[in-house]
Amino acid sequence: LVMDSENKSSSKALSTIKSLLFALIVALFIRYIFVQPFKIPSKSMYPTLMVGDQILVDRISYGVGLPCSKSKIIPSFKEIKRGDVVVFRYPKDLKSISCPNGGFVGLSSIYYIKRVVGVPGDIISIDLNDIYINGNLISKKIPKNYFLDGVKHNVYINIFDQGKTEVIYSGNGNLLGNIDSLVVPSESYFVLGDNRDNSMDSRFWGFVPRENIIGKAFLIH
């Protein structure tokens, strides 16, 4: 009777451990494949995102790809479009690696969050602080339908993940200067912070390669 009781206790404990391990694996799978949380440490996306806001990033809508390859582990079912707020690896990171077919992939934990304003094929023009996409002036006022779900205030950020925060640019940034017409290349995007006067974005370091984009921000909580 004593042995039988001990066996039942051991079996119950083992079952509990297995359940906890399974739950942990599922949580990690969701965390690294489906959604990822980030915390806003700066004001580059103000007034859409405020310092301290926590957001969730959809990692699968754009597909999950392989570095330096157009192949995808999970195929995309949504296109990256103008107005999307995206999180991406800093394209000029010193830890980036060159790809055999050209371009580069960021490897570090430095992430940025900005709004996509130019997609492949768009023509970008810059005249002082005025930016034109295909001849249309990009307003500094963010349209209401561009706000993220859950936003209760008018955005800026970049990111936080397991204690790692986005590095606010500390070097001497140089704007691209006035540009008559710059065509957004294939598999690349032109991004801006909503707080345009206080944002390091494509005006400073150029286009964001498709493979650097982690996902789309979809919820503030």
List each model region and its residues.
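Soluble "head" domains of membrane/secretory-pathway proteins
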Residues: V2-L14, F29, I33-F34, F38, ...
